[in-house]
Amino acid sequence: MAKRGGFPGGMPGNMNNLMKQAQRMQRQMEEQQAELENKEFSATAGGGVVEVTVTGKREVSKVKIDPEAVDPDDVEMLEDLIVAATNEALRKCEEESQAQMAKITGGLGGLGGGLF
């Protein structure tokens, strides 16, 4: 039989402390999520002729295109530059999200992965 306040099998521990820690982590994750949602992440492509900005909510908020990038005979190139800049901005957002999660979980390996 487990000792009072421990885990089955005699593993020591205090369930109340674990619950408090989990609640604290949840609160921190919610705070970090709110902070992340207010940030913007920008990336450029084509030497800066295309710039895309996304929010922490992973929504495109701005696209800037230098007029010199607009070639009616090569629309596909412009499309590729927009895609590249968008993907890079989203990658930066995800990188920041993972870094924030690692601060909270202390590197507990994927705990809550994908929450941000």
Curated annotation (Swiss-Prot):
Q: Supply the InterPro entries for this chain.
A: YbaB-like_sf, YbaB/EbfC
Q: Where is this region: Disordered?
A: 1-42
Gene Ontology MF annotations: DNA binding
Q: Fetch the Gene3D superfamilies from UniProt.
A: Nucleoid-associated protein YbaB-like domain
A Gene Ontology cellular component where this protein is annotated is: bacterial nucleoid
- Which residue intervals are annotated with compositional bias (Gly residues) in the record? 1-12
Compositional bias (Low complexity): 13-26
Keywords, A to Z? Answer: Cytoplasm, DNA-binding
Q: Report the subcellular localization.
A: Cytoplasm, Nucleoid
Record's subunit section: Homodimer.
Q: What does this chain do?
A: Binds to DNA and alters its conformation. May be involved in regulation of gene expression, nucleoid organization and DNA protection.
Name the HAMAP family for this protein: DNA_YbaB_EbfC
The UniProt entry's sequence similarity note says: Belongs to the YbaB/EbfC family.
The name on file for this protein is: Nucleoid-associated protein EUBELI_02017
Identify the species of origin. Lachnospira eligens (strain ATCC 27750 / DSM 3376 / VPI C15-48 / C15-B4) (Eubacterium eligens)
